Amino acid sequence: MAQTQTFNGRRRVRKFFGKIPEVAEMPNLIEVQKASYDQFLMVEEPQGGRPDEGLQAVFKSVFPISDFAGTAMLEFVKYEFEAPKFDTEECRQRDLTYAAPLKVTLRLIVFDIDEDTGSKSIKDIKEQDVYMGDMPLMTDNGTFIINGTERVIVSQMHRSPGVFFDHDKGKSHSSGKLLFAARVIPYRGSWLDIEFDAKDIVYARIDRRRKIPVTSLLMALGMDGEEILSTFYNKLTFIRDGDNWRVPFSAERFRGMKATADIIDADTGEVVLEAGKKMTARMARQLADKGLKAIRATEDDLLGNYLAEDIVNMKTGEIFLEAGDEIDEKTLKILLETAGNEVKFLDIDHVNIGGYIRNTLVADKNESRQDALFDIYRVMRPGEPPTLETAEAMFHSLFFDAERYDLSAVGRVKMNMRLELDCPDTVRVLRSEDMVAVVRTLVELRDGKGEIDDIDNLGNRRVRSVGELMENQYRLGLLRMERAIKERMSSIEIDTVMPQDLINAKPAAAAVREFFGSSQLSQFMDQTNPLSEITHKRRLSALGPGGLTRERAGFEVRDVHPTHYGRICPIETPEGPNIGLINSLATFARVNKYGFIETPYRKIVDGKVTEEVVYLSAMEEAKHYVAQANATIDENGGFADEFVVCRHAGEVIMAPRENVDLMDVSPKQLVSVAAALIPFLENDDANRALMGSNMQRQAVPLVRAEAPFVGTGMEPVVARDSGAAIAARRTGVVDQVDATRIVIRATEDVDASQSGVDIYRLQKFQRSNQNTCINQRPLVRVGDLINKGDIIADGPSTDLGDLALGRNVLVAFMPWNGYNYEDSILLSERIVRDDIFTSIHIEEFEVMARDTKLGPEEITRDIPNVSEEALKNLDEAGIVYIGAEVQPGDILVGKITPKGESPMTPEEKLLRAIFGEKASDVRDTSMRMPPGTYGTVVEVRVFNRHGVEKDERAMAIEREEIERLAKDRDDEQSILDRNVYARLSEMLIGKEAIAGPKGFKKGGALTKELLGEYPRSQWWQFAVEDEKLQSELEALRAQYDESKNALQQRFMDKVEKVQRGDEMPPGVMKMVKVFVAVKRKMQPGDKMAGRHGNKGVVSRIVPIEDMPFLEDGTHVDIVLNPLGVPSRMNVGQILETHLGWACAGMGRQIGELIDAYKEAGDIKPLRAKIESLIPDNDRNEPVRQYDDESVVRLSEQLRRGVSIATPVFDGAHESDINEMLEEAGLNSSGQVTLYDGRTGEEFDRKVTVGYIYMLKLHHLVDDKIHARSIGPYSLVTQQPLGGKAQFGGQRFGEMEVWALEAYGAAYTLQEMLTVKSDDVAGRTKVYEAIVRGDDTFEAGIPESFNVLVKEMRSLGLNVELENSSRFDTPPAQLPEAAE
């Protein structure tokens, strides 16, 4: 085979253990966010033809707005966005919101109204663009920048609009009877509940108000009693037959009935069923087949039936009996006398069909539509007297007015499905047919037909993503605005105004600001590492406005449901009160246009598994039989086994292979991104896997990232989609590289109008939201060929484009002197020495100089009463130098604030006038380093208000920025020149010129040498005879000039932005931000974890020579407790250890082969090793096609340890691990003999040793350790505050008091409760005593005692503190008590 392929070494190659082919492409992991918001803004859509959704729909629903008289109307025409003022980077630096101005075109139409006829004619039309505030834009990574911080809008899970049927599980009534209820939930508008009570009467409730009989609701819809009965019941016709009656026979009605008397055929008179026997379904069917038409009924059989129609005297119109009346002895008489030969009864048998609606109608006091409407009006607006008009209008507005009631397309679709209606999804209000269908379905449920709904089924819960949440919020803002517009239209002279004068866009802009700033779903992005970013964007929350609350959510809502499969991850959810309420989207899941989560399946046609992939929601999936992704498939593409394990209707069953019609696309489709990163997930207990998924999100990016030896193949996907690693936008060649930027010259799909240069700016040591460090490093060299999508730079926690959250370390599972008791972790000093788990954290400090009443604050180096030593790190402007090492208490920015003046004596005034200002008028308010923080200043930013003079430091920063912009411009210009002039010389060489620059002689073709004689800028003066070529030359020139000017214009715009003053909060003149970087090495007290939920705290760091070592003298890095595995059942960590050991062993072998090749020059053994290691299949790299150089490059990468991928649920088996261990020349038990580093003795038995991927978590002891001597006190109780952030003290709580009481340490206790806490006078005295060197003090009354007394007084109990001197008199002298 020709060795044609090259390997550039810029990506990590893994050996894949997965056996199941990947059929479907995994969707982009932040698609949920981006697609939703794009659909809302529709920036790309042409303005005229935008579909009615998102922002367009909001404007369409609120406009047109008419005034109260109908003389004018404001219509919406279109909207557009202008370019945002600042790009994302500038917004981050200047604390601004990344947003684009929204321009809306409105049309004001003024009408002339004819006073006599009332007809309207158009008088005037004006159109105008109106600015409607700024609309935040989403960055490429799916986040928003609000006031300079990155935020994520979390998607919300809520109950889908539509109709739901449920029962109370027998809880409401003591008899345990099931009371059924239906609820119609609109997207917005009034809820309608229809429910049974214990007496089987059907009631309706509107918006959880008082209940009314459902028949009143139906009457209000315009039905009368007879119509209601005929809607819900069939009619049964009894025909008089002499003294008896004939009843039609139907098998359906009589099956399962027990005969009380003989059943006799009305035609033949024979007995078809004797009394006391039961008619089975089969018997009923046989009788019907034999031709039994009717059976005989006596007059007594009429008793207990209900009339279906009124019985009326035709002559007088008098009603003898009403529809729904029950036939008893008295009414039977009337019936026999007045009825004709035919009587219609309601088909109610109290077995299959209950008389609930009929009973409700009888119980209902309302007789007519008017009564019913009045009744509903009284319930909804108690205390107001109803009139027919107001009652009708109110009832109409409740359910039938599109302004007030909106089912939404989803609600209509769900209703159609549940009630088997056929209504287009554009009808968004309720119809009377819908209400009748709801009541009918509810009654059928009560009769035992059909099933109740499962609220937790994902078919009944939908996702509201950013776009939709934003749409609702914006609609609220526009509605607030609409009221103001209406009022203004009526109060203003309408002929003279423009649309702009009517509109105040503040409410709309405020609604947007409020949503992004303070909504529960707008969250500060978790930016600890790339995985935590992605997970945050894919999160689904059941909390938030219109959702559940933690306290009210029961067990069912939080539980895993069968429909979660492939849609919501069953593993990843927080521990604690939010468990199950906050979930994560599964890897392949996507949200459809209705907001339901869909998951992909492969289609199975005629028993063959096809490559065709369909996405199904939970509702659509219910009727299918779905096979697992790991079902064995034979060579023909069919199932190998007769019976296949599959899922159907929420159950796992064995189904014959002919029935199976779908199959999972991938084994990892049921878990989320974080869970899919855990190798051997299938061998971990679910609770530990949950902890593993959650802790990976807390891993701190390390100084040297290292991809795991044992991965799952998801690593590159996360690194790419999170935006941490930079991917090339176009194919091209690298032109320049340094640490801060990469310049690539595009070689493909270069459009004439676009620039042919891509400049990628790398982020260097930027602070993330969690104070971790964002730093990107280039992976490419000048001259490298880059394909579109290649990774060209690594970011935080990525290594060659793979996610790298931790480090591979050599671990031994063994006890070590009790230092790994209770999950503690013992570390080797090598980890600290080699900076293996060292991370950089960046703290931001900000200081503002305000304009105060007493005069402006000033940022300066000239601070009163501060030694020169303390100012050593400040420059002349009073701002710390970059690179200064700072400690607690050091000044970062010098600032002075004017002090309040005390009135001056005339002498002082005189002295003041002679000698000028005196320094004591200002106090030092400099910003100092807080306690417990050390570090190096890495960046300083200075912001000035417009018109405030800039200091030297601000000018220097500005110059640096402009130089950087100029360099970008020059590079782009030089690449543009190179490209254009190369193209120009191509066009000219070999052609005959008819004109040229000065001194050019005509004749002969142009050559490269000839062109070289003239400067490039003069080449444009050559002209050729061929007109077509000449016009091409001119077009090239025009395009070149245009590009050049555009480039210069862009540069000028940016420079102008840099030089312009900054927008500041009111009263702020100047702001300085200082960034301090801290290097945090591993230390005892830091928390570490593996990927399997195996977490622990570092207990001790041991010198390398004392750690246990292997036979070759290698010391282990970390010792874990073997007892942490069996009870926790996370065996994945042991398998990972063994496999990691094998990877490292293989790496050693490859390293030896590389060294041999470098000495001897024979590559064959190395190539054979690599080819045997990475077999040829569609998931692995085609190493057999690599050229020699690529093989060496790949081997160098594998030398530290072979990287492998063991996908979840489709990973390496025990046999694979044994094979790898043997291939690496290691014992297949994975255990080795260890020696004690302190004595050199062998340990008693072999120990499991291997490589495990450990993470350093964000719970660092440096952030938690804290000490206080004197600090702030609480205002009311005068006790010290609590917590590190408040510089608080340690609470000596109730139990600690008990401990001191138990010891009898009375004085210590008194001290704790008084002078060390809230005895104000006492603690000042103690301080003074200590200063004097005296150690005696006296305790007084704690302030909290005074608070208690005050509180008791507020309850009316007068508590007074008696002075003890009254009781000092001896008892004998006390006045004697009266006898």
From Swiss-Prot:
GO terms for cellular component: DNA-directed RNA polymerase complex. The keyword Signal does not apply. GO terms for molecular function: DNA binding; DNA-directed RNA polymerase activity; ribonucleoside binding. It catalyses: RNA(n) + a ribonucleoside 5'-triphosphate = RNA(n+1) + diphosphate. Its EC number is 2.7.7.6. Gene3D superfamilies: 2.40.50.100, 2.40.50.150, 3.90.1100.10, DNA-directed RNA polymerase, beta subunit, external 1 domain, DNA-directed RNA polymerase, subunit 2, domain 6, RNA polymerase alpha subunit dimerisation domain, RNA polymerase Rpb2, domain 2. InterPro entries: DNA-dir_RNA_pol_bsu_ext_1_sf (IPR042107), DNA-dir_RNA_pol_bsu_external_1 (IPR019462), DNA-dir_RNA_pol_su2 (IPR015712), DNA-dir_RNAP_su2_dom (IPR007120), DNA-dir_RNAP_su2_hyb_sf (IPR037033), RNA_pol_bsu_bac (IPR010243), RNA_pol_bsu_CS (IPR007121), RNA_pol_bsu_protrusion (IPR007644). It comes from the Bacteria. It is an enzyme of class 2 (transferase). GO terms for biological process: DNA-templated transcription. Keywords: DNA-directed RNA polymerase, Nucleotidyltransferase, Transcription, Transferase. The RNAP catalytic core consists of 2 alpha, 1 beta, 1 beta' and 1 omega subunit. When a sigma factor is associated with the core the holoenzyme is formed, which can initiate transcription. Belongs to the RNA polymerase beta chain family. DNA-dependent RNA polymerase catalyzes the transcription of DNA into RNA using the four ribonucleoside triphosphates as substrates. This is DNA-directed RNA polymerase subunit beta. It comes from Chelativorans sp. (strain BNC1). The gene is rpoB.
